[in-house]
């Protein structure tokens, strides 16, 4: 299995949209916009993100197929990372490898991340990449329709 990162292209949008509509993936991602599965809203959101020079949005490619996306972006002048892996690819080390590759592209530290506190898989990915837990917060999770706890992590 060969994992690589590449720039997101127009032709990737259909596959990325379809991966993003999986109900279990939405539940685990938790902190997503309320209109996440609306195709027009998805295309508008992707257009905004792709036009923003502070966002590095990449496709996770596994053996020539789209396995998900990974991005770095800024919130309140802090560098954060996020990723989404197609549920059919969970548990194969793809997110861990993609995150290590993305982190190798920047020397900037600290890097921040957040995950639903019950998303054990995502927390494991972040910790394998060297992130450590630095706090918890509560917030409304659009993917669950309720307020839940999220874990805040940092890589120094």
PLM region spans:
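A short, aromatic/hydrophobic, helix- or strand-capping loop or linear motif
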Residues: 28-33, 55-61
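Acyl-donor (CoA/ACP) binding surface of acyl/acetyltransferases
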Residues: 1-24, 57-156
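Short loop/turn motifs at secondary-structure junctions and domain boundaries
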Residues: 48-53
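Conserved GNAT-fold acetyl-CoA-binding loop/helix
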Residues: 24-46
